[in-house]
């Protein structure tokens, strides 16, 4: 097929989340998508890409050229359109208010590569000719503390929707979209596997905010008491879902867990230090159990169902590189 726009064939590769010609998405192979880069310059070096990627993520300059430069160009057009609409509205209302940040949400399973995508995009976007101020915040800091989760008997549900302080998360995004200065984002330590008490990152009116987390496209049940509660995605100007087959994510998760045993888990201060001292077979069994009893359930019940809410879906293949892109029609 020579055309870049794919309908039925694309839906087959993306698990039939829409049917026939009524799909709200346009589908592209990675090679077709790469052509949309046009003349977008490569502004990252190989060393920078290696620094930005997560453990066991093979992204390289070729993948940046193939996928992320076109994505950067697309996002640039959305940001420019948002700015134009803002200026037109100012003229319409005869006001001179300051534009609020453009927020990009990035969702997907654990071990699928969300953090790498977020960090690479942050650097690419910050190097646009307009030199926008770009900040990155993850939802990890909005998890309840381990002490709270233990108290509520929810530690084994960490990462599930109920383990997040949704009210605090919504207050944060509301403040960002209201254009407030010096908004505090709580910090999280992957070493101690816990939020850091009284530690925050200050977000001061960026031009663009990238908000990354497994549950950022989560929907809510309609309220029964008549109170209207916004969803996290209500604050997004653009959203991205990182996708892959369950079996691939499973393999990546276990492989990453085993590699962390040889690196981060060896730190005596690591919450998972005990896994660095057991046998490889024992560690593999634990990783499999964590996947099947926690992460797979969360993926099926809470994360994957949010995929059709994304504006753009990056579908990865066996080598952890993007094979297909789905872009929502306007």
Swiss-Prot record:
GO terms for cellular component: cytoplasm. ATP binds at residues 108-115. One of its GO terms (molecular function) is ATP binding. GO terms for biological process: coenzyme A biosynthetic process. Transmembrane segments: none annotated. HAMAP family: Pantothen_kinase_1. This is Pantothenate kinase. The lineage of its organism: Bacteria, Pseudomonadati, Pseudomonadota, Alphaproteobacteria, Hyphomicrobiales.
């Amino acid at each position: 097929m020579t055309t870049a726009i794919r309908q039925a064939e694309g839906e087959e590769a993306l698990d039939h989340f829409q049917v026939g010609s009524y799909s709200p998405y346009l589908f592209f192979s990675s090679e077709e998508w790469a052509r949309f880069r046009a003349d977008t310059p490569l502004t990252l070096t190989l060393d920078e890409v290696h620094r930005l990627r997560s453990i066991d993520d093979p992204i390289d300059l070729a993948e940046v050229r193939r996928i992320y430069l076109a994505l950067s160009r697309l996002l640039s057009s959305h940001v420019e359109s948002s700015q134009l609409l803002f200026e037109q509205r100012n003229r319409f209302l005869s006001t001179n208010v300051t534009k609020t940040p453009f927020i990009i949400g990035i969702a997907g399973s654990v071990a699928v590569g969300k953090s790498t995508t977020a960090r690479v995009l942050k650097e690419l976007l910050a190097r646009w000719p307009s030199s926008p101020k770009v900040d990155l915040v993850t939802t990890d800091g909005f998890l309840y503390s381990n002490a709270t989760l233990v108290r509520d008997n929810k530690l084994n549900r960490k990462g599930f929707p109920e383990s997040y302080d949704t009210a605090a998360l919504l207050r944060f995004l509301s403040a960002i979209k209201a254009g407030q200065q010096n908004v505090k984002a709580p910090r999280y330590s992957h070493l101690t596997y816990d939020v850091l008490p009284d530690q925050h990152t200050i977000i001061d009116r960026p031009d663009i905010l990238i908000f990354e987390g497994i549950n950022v496209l989560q929907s809510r049940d309609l309220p029964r008491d008549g109170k209207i509660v916004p969803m996290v995605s209500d604050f997004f100007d653009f959203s991205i879902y990182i996708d892959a087959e369950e079996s691939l994510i499973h393999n990546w998760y276990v492989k990453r867990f085993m590699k962390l045993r040889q690196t981060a888990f060896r730190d005596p201060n690591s919450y998972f230090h005990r896994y660095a001292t057991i046998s490889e077979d024992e560690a593999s069994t634990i990783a499999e159990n964590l996947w099947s009893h926690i992460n797979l359930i969360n993926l099926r019940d809470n994360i994957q169902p949010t995929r059709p809410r994304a504006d753009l879906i990056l579908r990865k293949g066996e080598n952890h590189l993007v094979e297909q892109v789905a872009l929502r029609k306007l």
